[in-house]
């Protein structure tokens, strides 16, 4: 009879990552309800882990294809901030290694702030290279948001020390002399694009939280410049700030 306590068995199961581990057989016939519950929880955890690994590998298929076809440096690209009434559009290019294995990397919109912050630090640390480019509100007003996004993306690529052999871009085709694959919802289909989306969002969110101190009353730390009720109330009360986009409605109504 297994003399381990249920707590000891649970702790041991937390260290096991393989269903063929011999220890599982030693506790399989333990009739204690707590042990059987712990085994079921372990099996569910491993099933979720396997599902996450398969999803990760599926999101790495574009990078693997281009590596296998002679490309060395593949840059995933994404942007954050095309829709807000205030603040910049931020773009990012990320080049990853083939051994990159942060399974949690996915579309930044599906992650909590805590998850994004942790992944941001890991991506910046583990990526071959990360490049960020920004266009502020005056440039957006001058060029239009789509052109300003393309411009920032191209600058992000040109700032890379390693010239990419191929680009994987989320939705926005670029006028640049590098072969590229454009994916709709690319941050859900490519690990490199997802990594770029996380870095771009964390970078922009940090900027907007700083702007919240400079321009209080609009809720920038919470709404990141999007047109929430609090933001619109701030515009009504105080007018537009220098970081508001004059070409985005309803901002022109609140220009002094």
From Swiss-Prot:
Annotated compartments: Cytoplasm
Primary location: cytoplasm
Entry annotated with the keyword Hydrolase: yes
Matching Pfam families: RNase_HII
GO cellular component: cytoplasm; ribonuclease H2 complex
Catalytic activity: Endonucleolytic cleavage to 5'-phosphomonoester
Cofactor(s) of this protein: Mn(2+); Mg(2+)
Entry function: Endonuclease that specifically degrades the RNA of RNA-DNA hybrids.
GO MF annotation terms: manganese ion binding; RNA binding; RNA-DNA hybrid ribonuclease activity
Record has DNA damage as a keyword: no
Cofactor note: Manganese or magnesium. Binds 1 divalent metal ion per monomer in the absence of substrate. May bind a second metal ion after substrate binding.
Keyword tags: Cytoplasm, Endonuclease, Hydrolase, Manganese, Metal-binding, Nuclease
Superkingdom of this protein's organism: Bacteria
Entry EC number(s): 3.1.26.4
Protein name: Ribonuclease HII
CDD domains, per database record: RNase_HII_bacteria_HII_like
